[in-house]
């Protein structure tokens, strides 16, 4: 049966509205520089020219625009004696989906690379681009919002592929074509895109061979102009070690005379995987002679195929017995999801991801000495928890269900990284004189969102679980709330608060403990303990919990909040409306938009009001537009009622704005 399409507002263009096969699902934007391939694009692919892009004509702009500003970060005293501050940094190149397949606002599956170890990252590249889909890929809003909440900048990708992978030199020439004034229109366009969408710059990878010295000179001038224009907008540019200054492609595996001008023209350079200990040592020295920071060089570490079993000469990059040589870039760490079998669960993914980022010990205070040098053992973690209010429900940005106040508000799987909370950076530091309990994100139950924090073990001594490095000001009116539950056994719970940091890296955090109650399985379900920190003044430097039990116990933490008393609900959004609809065999897809609420808002949540008056969660976003697929009438209704609420940092919800859609 063919699809019928109705548009409510001109945010879906007339051509799309007239098409009987229109798909209203918005995706992250991708383009060719200008000229398009010959032939016909494959299913689900739209060929576009960046040269022709204009923000005012972009019907998906509201869906792809990030809303969270880049947070400031601080580096606490390292949790071990191997991680360092002020030396090597880590970049990650992540393909969340193929170029044309990145939904703008999450999707109805929990099977997603929900990156969450932001504490160790300094730059995320939203990796993509292919000859058959498009060469320039802008990151989607959920990824940018999650990264920014944790202080990590995100770059889009400009990928000019090798001819063996379908590359065509005309696309390189399109990119660096000058206008009548000798300037580069597409450099300006790339800056315009990043500024409009709210991300932080571009990773430029020119690998199409066959160029000459003139093309090399044009590319260098293009990169310089891109950096100059980008710097004025607060953007950064990373160059990939491929094209040389003479226009040829020759991966150097080093910073040298063939590519140093590109490094000087950009903010950083990714050194191709062909590096050696000698080439990295020479690269760092050359960077410093050029007046640059050696840690602006990312040595490529390819983990796409083997993950933590990858063979890496770590001492060439981050030796343990002397200063780090350069920084490094992890190529395709989403292996932690991809290597798992079909049917993988969110819990299995996070177990693998923790193993990758923390190490085999699953405790960064106990760094491993095996062949995999996990990031937690190399670089000091960073945190953005430095102001009130602060709250978390340990929501990882995907789940099997959606919970509100401990009850299921939607039984559907989902993912949306923009809804991800700031999560514990040190996973999982547990200090005990006895047996160590296991700590994990659990998806079988939650207080809010899709997950909670679960501590499970056979206790023979108190165990302190370190949760957050903080810089939170304390006053007599400061309140800390723990929403928690005992699933098995009886557990005595204490809030752990530190007013100072350890003197040396690797030393235990000097906590003070505040009683938070004793819970017994099967008694009261979820319980919220509100604690005033009487006698504790100054700045909270770390937060955790201490658990005491005898024998087997399972304790679940659903939420943690630190606030001043007297919090109020946020103002409501307005003008919720349907901006596009498309009906087909699987139901009706709707595009929604609304006017943002005045004042601070963490995100917005969209619900459907069912005929009986109950509400079903449809999704959430930090922006002001959302897409919902496959809706159907329920209970004989002739129209469906929807409501949008603003949610603040403490998860207080505003009054709703409503709209109705007739079937």
Place the predicted regions along the sequence by residue.
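Substrate-binding cleft of secreted/luminal carbohydrate-active enzymes
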Residues: 20-64, 297, 301-438
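Recognizes extended acidic, P/S/T-rich segments that occur
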Residues: 603-637
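Extracellular carbohydrate recognition and processing domains
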Residues: 504-540
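Extra-cytoplasmic beta-strand recognition segments
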Residues: 464-497, 527-532, 543-545, 560
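Conserved aromatic anchor
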Residues: 586-601
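Chitinase-like catalytic core of GlcNAc-active glycosidases
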Residues: 83-282
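Short carbohydrate-recognition loop motifs
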Residues: 433-464, 518
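Beta-strand-rich modules
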Residues: 626-660
């Amino acid at each position: 049966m063919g699809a019928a399409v109705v548009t409510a507002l001109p945010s879906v263009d007339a051509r799309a509205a007239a098409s009987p096969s229109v798909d209203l699902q918005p995706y992250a934007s991708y383009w060719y520089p200008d000229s398009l391939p010959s032939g016909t694009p494959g299913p689900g692919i739209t060929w576009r020219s960046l040269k022709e892009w204009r923000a005012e004509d972009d019907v998906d702009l509201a869906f792809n625009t990030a809303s969270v500003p880049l947070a400031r970060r601080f580096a606490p005293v390292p949790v071990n004696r191997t991680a360092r501050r002020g030396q090597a940094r880590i970049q990650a190149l992540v393909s969340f989906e193929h170029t044309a397949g990145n939904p703008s606002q999450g999707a109805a599956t929990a099977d997603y690379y929900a990156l969450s170890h932001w504490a160790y990252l300094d730059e995320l590249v939203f990796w993509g681009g292919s000859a058959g889909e498009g060469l320039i890929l802008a990151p989607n809003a959920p990824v940018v919002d999650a990264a920014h909440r944790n202080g990590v900048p995100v770059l889009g990708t400009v990928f000019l592929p090798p001819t063996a992978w379908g590359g065509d030199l005309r696309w390189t020439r399109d990119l660096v074509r000058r206008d009548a004034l000798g300037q580069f229109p597409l450099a300006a366009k790339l800056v315009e895109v990043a500024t409009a969408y709210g991300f932080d710059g571009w990773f430029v990878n020119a690998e199409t061979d066959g160029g000459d010295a003139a093309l090399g000179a044009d590319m260098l001038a293009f990169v310089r102009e891109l950096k100059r224009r980008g710097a004025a907008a607060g953007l950064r540019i990373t160059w990939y070690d491929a094209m040389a200054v003479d226009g040829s492609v020759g991966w150097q595996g080093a910073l040298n005379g063939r590519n140093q001008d590109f490094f000087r023209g950009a903010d950083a350079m990714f050194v191709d995987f062909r590096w050696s200990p000698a080439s990295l040592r020479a690269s760092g020295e050359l960077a410093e002679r050029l007046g640059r920071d050696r840690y602006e060089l990312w040595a490529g570490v390819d983990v796409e195929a083997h993950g933590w079993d990858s063979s890496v000469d770590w001492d060439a990059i981050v030796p343990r017995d002397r200063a780090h040589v350069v920084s490094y870039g992890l190529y395709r760490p989403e292996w932690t999801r991809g290597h798992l079998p079909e049917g993988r669960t969110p819990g299995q993914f996070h177990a693998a991801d923790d193993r990758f980022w923390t190490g085999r010990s699953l405790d960064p205070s106990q760094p491993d000495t095996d062949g995999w040098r996990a990031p937690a053992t190399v670089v000091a973690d960073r945190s953005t928890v430095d102001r009130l209010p602060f709250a978390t429900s340990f929501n990882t940005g995907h789940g099997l269900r959606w919970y509100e106040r401990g009850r299921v508000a939607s039984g559907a799987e989902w993912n949306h990284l923009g809804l991800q909370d700031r999560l514990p950076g040190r996973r999982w530091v547990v200090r005990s004189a006895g047996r160590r309990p296991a700590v994990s994100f659990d998806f079988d139950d939650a207080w809010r969102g899709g997950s909670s924090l679960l501590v499970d073990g056979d206790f023979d001594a108190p165990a302190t679980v370190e949760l957050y490095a903080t810089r939170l000001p304390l006053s007599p009116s400061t309140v800390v709330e723990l929403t928690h539950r005992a699933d098995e056994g009886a557990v005595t719970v204490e809030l752990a608060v530190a007013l100072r940091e350890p003197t040396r890296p690797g030393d235990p955090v000097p906590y003070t403990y505040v009683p938070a109650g004793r819970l017994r399985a099967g008694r009261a379900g979820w319980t919220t303990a509100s604690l005033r920190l009487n006698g504790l003044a100054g700045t909270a430097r770390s937060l955790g919990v201490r658990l005491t039990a005898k024998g087997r116990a399972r304790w679940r933490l659903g939420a943690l909040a630190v606030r001043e008393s007297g919090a109020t609900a946020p103002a409501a959004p307005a003008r919720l409306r349907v901006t596009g609809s498309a009906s087909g065999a699987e139901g009706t897809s709707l595009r929604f938009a609304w006017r943002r609420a005045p004042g601070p808002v963490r995100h917005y949540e969209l619900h459907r009001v069912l005929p009986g008056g109950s509400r079903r969660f449809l999704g959430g976003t930090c922006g002001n537009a959302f897409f919902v697929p496959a809706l159907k009438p329920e209970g004989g209704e002739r129209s469906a009622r929807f409501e949008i609420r603003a949610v603040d940092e403490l998860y207080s919800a505003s009054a709703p704005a409503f709209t109705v859609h007739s079937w």
